């Protein structure tokens, strides 16, 4: 994929993601070891990563959803990101079920779990961030954590609508729009995503929200 993006001449910032724990949707065959993930990520960074501003390829690392992984691999992810000076990406507060899982198992909200595990700050950016309460909204702003809203995917999965006006008012500066992935959206058009984001926010938060 990285070679194909280079050949096409498009900007591509891939993330070496992983699953470290089996579940109903994660069979044992796709579970990665810490050594395998970190070794592969370092290989990709050394081969393709260009740290310069506006570069065409910057390689990152990150779990799909951090609190579904082992704490050991999350810690190793942060350590490697600091060592190689690369970004960390994943999903945060996408669904109500996700919030309920974190509250039940860890006794806190999703963004607070991320804070406790050093997963917020300039190095980090997360997709969705729908089900954040007021304190979490401010936490994202105070830590300068990046957010990427994925409205088409969120509508397909009935996940909800990202609180974009509240996040911007709170002071979130690193804000973008994403398409999520083929498993949750059948469109990879950024222009369509921008159009839908505008309409969804007007529907969700009012005609003066964007």
Stretch-by-stretch model annotation:
Residues 1-130, 135:
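Metal-coordinating catalytic core of metallo-dependent amide/deamination hydrolases
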Residues 12, 88, 147, 174-175:
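Hydrophobic beta-strand scaffold residues
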Residues 132, 136-144, 150-156:
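Long hydrophobic segments that form regular secondary structure
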Residues 6, 82, 141, 168-169:
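Anion (oxyanion) recognition and catalysis
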Residues 116-123, 165-210:
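His/Asp/Glu-enriched, well-ordered alpha-helical/loop segment
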Residues 126-129, 148, 176-179:
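Active-site neighborhood of phospho(di)ester-bond hydrolases with catalytic His/Asp-centered motifs
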Residues 96-108, 136-141, 158-167, 185-202:
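Histidine/acidic-residue-rich catalytic or RNA/ligand-binding cores of hydrolases
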Residues 17-19, 94, 151-155, 180-183:
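Short, acidic/turn-prone active-site loops that include or flank metal/cofactor-
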